[in-house]
Each structure stands twice: as structure tokens, then as C-alpha cells.
């Protein structure tokens, strides 16, 4: 198929690579603007642009599609279908039906659950055992279009958002390649989303990453997993942020007040119910270290309180 691809980050680049490998004709790529990256703020092309340029595919980076300035260009490209994967720009109504087979989107949740920009993270934050990949027709809403295909994806108990992102990216790319021939053959029947089941997945903020030990151990563990790799879950100790990069639920009962140190090898803290092991932490202004090493540096012992 002749495809106009719209996407920006790594997950979109993986899908673009899969479509290229499958032999599809990618007539052009639309992506977001290059951005300064890292401490030195080096202007860097988004992953999709890098992939497109490596394969000799024309790249366009309009600031917006809403003003109509790209309409004639897109029409002139004459795509069979427009494929959108984490583009980051709203597709306006006048472009939804330009292509013969319309405009489809790959969304990484089991829609209508987790509409929004952070579906992977919220699935982990909420302790879900399953998420998925949904191929949907784009409409004028945010992730509200008719569903064409759903592929469930398992979430392992200790999996981080970053690890789930990698899993979903690969499955999403594979699913997209498998679904396109079915769309062309007219074998998929669009299904309306059940609005009563809709939930939102808003973007994460640094402030949202904070937890405290008066919360349930399972909630804290999910927070540590879901906020990894960004912004990283943290608790406050002596006025400093202590980020927790890895944790696990303790099998031992917590017969102590929340925040009590139950053990330092491994560093185990009592919670509202149960206890959590802090395997790896990053003190404010410091480097990542084992929870046990941090506890030793703070001269913590069983019975102390965080």
C-alpha cells in the first residue's frame, strides 16, 4: 500500500521500520520538529525523521496541521492510507478522509481504556495484568474512533513502563503490518467504542511521582514500576528526594508503623499494609545505588523511621 506515515518517537520509528521491511510504499513522513536534547541541548531529529532519512523517504515537519497549510501537499501525495503512531499533532477533519482507506491510528491500550498520552504508564501504575494494542479509525475526538483490531499484551508483575513500552512497540509494529492487508481487503468491521468504559491516561508530571509509606505496598510498587524510566517515583527523607528505581513486594508481614525500617539487608520498609523492598535508589544530587548501600550511608537500622 502507498502509505503516508505520521509519527515522532521511538515507538513510531519501530512501526515505520516494520512497514518499510514489509515492502509498503512510504510516500512521505510527517513528524514533529527537531528538539534540543541532553545537557548540551544538541538539536536532534526525532526517531521517525532519522528512520525516514536513512531510507530516503521525504520528511515534512509542519508546526501544525490545523491551519490547512499542508492540505494540498497531503492530497498531492495521494496515499492509499494515512497511518498515525504517536505523532503528537491533531489530525484535522479535512484530512481524515483524504486517503482511499482513511486515516488509522495505533494506540497502545485496550480502548476505550486509557485514552490519552500515557496509556502504557497508567496501565502499570494501576497494577493491570494486561494492556494491548488497538488499531482504530481516527475521528475528531481524542482516541475515540471506531476500533478495527485489538491485540492484547500481557504485563509481567514486576515490569516497568519502559520494559512494557519495548514490548508494546514490537507487538504494535507487528500488528500494524498484519492489519493493513485486512483493511485493504475489507475484512475488518469497525466497532464503536463503549463510552461508559472510557478512562483517561493523562501525561505524567514530576510532582505525581511522589509517594509515601502510608500507602499500600502494592500501590508503591506499582508507582515505582510505572514512573520508570520517567519521572521516577520518589519519597522525601530529611528534606531530600530519594528516587526509587527498583523495588519488590516483601513476603514478610509488616508488624510496624508505616515508614518503619524492618530490615536493611535488603532495605525493607513497612507500608500501610505489607512491606516493600527498595532494591535501588538515587538520592537527590547523587548516583544510583543499592537500597542497602544507601541505608548504610544513612546509618539506618531496623526500627528507624523514614
Map each language-model feature to its residues.
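N-terminal Rossmann-like dinucleotide-binding module
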Residues: 1-39
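N-terminal glycine-/serine-/threonine-rich beta1-alpha1-beta2 phosphate-ribose binding loop
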Residues: 36-78
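An anion-binding loop in the catalytic cleft
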Residues: 213-306
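Acyl-group handling in specialized metabolite and lipid biosynthesis
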Residues: 202-215
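Short beta->alpha connector loops
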Residues: 8-11, 63-66, 87-90, 227, ...
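A residue-level signal for conserved active-site and pocket-lining positions in enzyme catalytic cores
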Residues: 7, 29, 52, 82, ...
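Donor/substrate-binding cores of folate-linked one-carbon enzymes
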Residues: 22, 32, 81-200, 207
